[in-house]
C-alpha cells in the first residue's frame, strides 16, 4: 500500500491504481518526528472482500471511476502489501492521551488505526487516508487492533450520511471485510474502514505533550495545526490563544448541528474530539428516535455522561481540557519574564475564550431551531417556542426526525391538516396547545405555507441513519449480501429529498428496534 509513484514501490497487481494514489508520501504530520507516531506495516487481513465504497469520496480524491473495480482493490485497502513495505512508505499510528468518561486515561493513541497516505483533493485541500482495523500498534493496549464488520459498516454509512446532512465530519472511502474471526461480546468478523480527513489531530494529541511536560513538542504540534489549518491564527497577537478560540468556536458550532438533527455521538472523550471541529470516531452513536432529552445511545455509558442533553456541556468541558493543554504556549508572545505572572495571564485569557462557547452555541442552536420551525423572522420568544416543542415531544416520546419533517405540513390557518404530525404525540391535547402557539407565531411571518414548507424540508431531513436501518444492512452483509449497504448509502446521500420509492426508510422504527444496543465493544 505504498503511495509512491515509483514503479518499484507499487503493488505489482495495481500499477495504474498505485500510480493514481501516488506521490507525496504520508503527509505533513509524519514529518513532525518519531515523538508523534510509530511507523509500522498493517497486519494482513486474510481473504479480503469489498463491502462498500463511496464513489463521491473517490471523486473527491481524484480517483478514477473504475477505482473500486480494479484488481487488488480489496487487498490495497485491507492493508495487505503485495511486497515488502518500503521504509519511506510505512504507515504510522499516532500517539495521544486524553480524558475518557471524565477521567484522565493517560497515554492512548491509534490502537487500530494507521494513516497510509495523503492525497490532493479536487477541492484544493489535502486529505489523509487512515485505515481503521489494520492490526495491533504500540498503542493497542489490550486490544487486538482489529475492527469488526458491524462497526465498520456503521462508520462508513454515518460518515457519509453526516456529510450529506451538512455536518462537518470525517469521510469514509471504503469498507473491506474478511471472514477472520475476532472476539468481542460475541464472535464477529474483521473489517477495515478507510477514513478520510484533512487531519486526524485530536484534543488528546495536545493533552499528551502537555501531560508529558514537553512544551517543545506541544508547540511543534500547535504550529503544525496553525500553519496548515488555521493560518489566520498566525496573524493574531497570540496565535496559540487564537487556535484555542478557533477550535472552541468550531466545536460549539458542531454540537449545535448535532443537537438540531438529534445526533448522539456516544463517546465524547477528549481523544475523540477533532481539533478541526469535525465529527470523528463513529462508535456507539445514534440518532434519537422517540425523543428523550436524556437519551443515551451508548450501552456502556451507564452514568449518562454523554446523553443527548449533556453533549453541549461535555463539549465545553472538553474545550477546557484543550485550554489546559495549551496553557504553556498562551502568552509567550507577550514577553512576560515572570513565569507565574505569565501563567496567571494565560489562565485569564483562556477563561475569556472558553466563555465564548455558550455565547456561540446558544445562538447557533437558536438559528438552527428557528430554521427547523420555518421561522424567517427573528423574535424574542422563538427559543421558548422551540423548547416548549421539545418538552412536549419528550413527554409524548414523539419521533424526533418525523416530528420536524411533518411540521412542514401544518397550515397557518387550518388545524385539520395537523394529523400527520399530531398523530406522533401520545398527549395530543398538549400538541394542540403548542400548535396554537406556533400558529400565532406563524401569523407574523410573510411566507405562505408552501414557501415555508419548502424551506423547512431543506433543513429537516426525512432520512437519517436510524439504528434499525443500519442493523438490517449489517445482518445482510454478514451473509455476504452487500446490496443493502449500497442502497442505504444511496438513500442517505439525499436526506432532504422525498424519494417516494424509499418511503420505508423514513418510517417509524419497528418494535424490535427498541431492543438494539450499541456499545464501545467494536
From Swiss-Prot:
This is Protein nucleotidyltransferase YdiU. The keyword Nucleotidyltransferase applies. Belongs to the SELO family. Nucleotidyltransferase involved in the post-translational modification of proteins. It can catalyze the addition of adenosine monophosphate (AMP) or uridine monophosphate (UMP) to a protein, resulting in modifications known as AMPylation and UMPylation. NCBIfam families: PRK00029.1 (NF000658). The keyword Manganese applies. It comes from the Bacteria. It comes from Burkholderia ambifaria (strain ATCC BAA-244 / DSM 16087 / CCUG 44356 / LMG 19182 / AMMD) (Burkholderia cepacia (strain AMMD)). Its EC number is 2.7.7.-, 2.7.7.108. It catalyses: L-seryl-[protein] + ATP = 3-O-(5'-adenylyl)-L-seryl-[protein] + diphosphate; L-threonyl-[protein] + ATP = 3-O-(5'-adenylyl)-L-threonyl-[protein] + diphosphate; L-tyrosyl-[protein] + ATP = O-(5'-adenylyl)-L-tyrosyl-[protein] + diphosphate; L-histidyl-[protein] + UTP = N(tele)-(5'-uridylyl)-L-histidyl-[protein] + diphosphate. The active site is at residue 271. It is an enzyme of class 2 (transferase). Its cofactor is Mg(2+); Mn(2+). Keywords: ATP-binding, Magnesium, Manganese, Metal-binding, Nucleotide-binding, Nucleotidyltransferase, Transferase. Pfam families: SelO. GO terms for molecular function: AMPylase activity; ATP binding; magnesium ion binding. ATP binds at residues 109, 111-112, 132, 144-145, 195, 202, 281. Mg(2+) binds at residues 272, 281.
Amino acid at each position: 500500500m505504498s503511495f509512491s509513484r515509483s514503479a518499484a514501490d507499487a503493488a505489482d497487481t495495481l500499477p495504474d491504481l498505485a500510480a493514481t494514489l501516488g506521490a507525496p508520501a504520508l503527509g505533513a504530520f509524519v514529518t513532525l518526528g518519531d515523538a508523534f507516531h510509530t511507523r509500522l506495516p498493517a497486519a494482513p487481513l486474510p481473504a479480503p472482500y469489498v463491502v462498500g465504497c463511496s464513489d463521491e469520496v473517490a471523486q473527491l480524491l481524484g480517483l478514477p471511476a473504475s477505482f473500486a473495480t480494479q484488481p487488488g482493490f480489496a487487498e490495497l485497502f485491507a492493508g495487505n502489501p503485495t511486497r515488502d513495505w518500503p521504509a519511506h512508505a510505512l504507515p504510522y499510528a499516532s500517539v495521544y492521551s486524553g480524558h475518557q468518561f471524565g477521567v484522565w486515561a493517560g497515554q492512548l493513541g491509534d490502537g487500530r488505526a494507521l494513516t497510509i497516505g495523503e492525497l490532493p483533493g479536487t477541492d484544493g485541500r489535502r486529505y489523509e487516508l487512515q485505515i481503521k482495523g489494520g492490526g495491533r500498534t504500540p498503542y493497542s493496549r489490550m486490544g487486538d487492533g482489529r475492527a469488526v464488520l458491524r462497526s465498520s459498516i456503521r462508520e462508513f454509512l454515518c460518515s457519509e450520511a453526516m456529510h450529506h446532512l451538512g455536518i462537518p465530519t470525517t469521510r469514509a472511502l471504503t469498507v473491506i471485510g474478511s471472514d477472520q474471526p475476532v472476539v468481542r461480546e460475541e464472535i464477529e468478523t474483521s473489517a477495515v474502514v478507510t477514513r478520510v480527513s484533512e487531519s486526524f489531530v485530536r484534543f488528546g494529541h495536545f493533552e499528551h505533550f502537555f501531560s508529558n511536560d514537553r512544551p517543545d513538542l506541544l508547540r511543534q504540534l500547535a504550529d503544525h495545526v496553525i500553519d496548515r489549518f488555521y493560518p489566520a491564527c498566525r496573524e493574531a497577537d497570540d496565535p496559540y490563544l487564537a487556535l484555542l478560540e478557533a477550535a472552541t468556536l468550531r466545536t460549539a458550532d458542531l454540537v449545535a448541528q448535532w443537537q438540531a438533527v438529534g445526533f448522539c455521538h456516544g463517546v465524547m472523550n477528549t481523544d475523540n474530539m477533532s481539533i478541526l471541529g469535525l465529527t470523528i470516531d463513529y462508535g456507539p452513536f445514534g440518532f434519537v428516535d422517540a425523543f428523550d432529552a436524556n437519551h443515551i445511545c451508548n450501552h456502556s455509558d451507564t452514568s449518562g455522561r454523554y446523553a443527548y442533553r449533556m453533549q453541549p456541556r461535555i463539549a465545553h468541558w472538553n474545550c477546557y481540557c484543550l485550554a489546559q493543554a495549551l496553557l504553556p504556549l498562551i502568552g509567550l508572545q507577550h514577553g512576560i519574564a515572570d513565569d507565574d505572572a505569565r501563567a496567571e495571564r494565560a489562565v485569564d485569557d483562556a477563561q475569556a475564550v472558553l466563555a465564548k462557547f455558550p455565547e456561540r452555541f446558544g445562538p447557533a442552536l437558536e438559528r438552527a431551531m428557528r430554521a427547523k420551525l420555518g421561522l424567517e423572522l427573528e423574535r424574542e420568544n422563538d427559543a421558548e417556542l422551540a423548547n416548549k416543542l421539545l418538552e412536549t415531544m419528550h413527554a409524548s416520546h414523539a419521533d424526533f426526525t418525523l416530528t420536524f419533517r411533518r411540521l412542514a405540513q401544518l397550515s397557518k390557518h387550518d388545524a385539520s391538516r395537523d394529523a400527520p404530525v399530531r398523530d406522533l404525540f401520545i398527549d395530543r391535547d398538549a400538541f394542540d396547545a403548542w400548535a396554537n402557539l406556533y400558529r400565532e407565531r406563524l401569523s407574523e411571518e410573510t411566507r405562505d405555507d408552501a414557501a415555508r414548507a419548502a424551506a423547512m424540508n431543506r433543513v429537516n431531513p426525512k432520512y437519517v441513519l436510524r439504528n434499525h436501518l443500519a442493523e438490517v444492512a449489517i445482518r445482510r452483509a454478514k451473509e455476504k449480501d452487500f446490496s443493502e449497504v449500497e442502497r442505504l448509502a444511496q438513500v442517505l446521500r439525499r436526506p432532504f429529498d422525498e424519494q417516494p420509492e424509499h418511503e420505508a426508510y423514513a418510517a417509524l422504527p419497528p418494535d424490535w428496534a427498541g431492543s438494539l444496543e450499541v456499545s464501545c465493544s467494536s
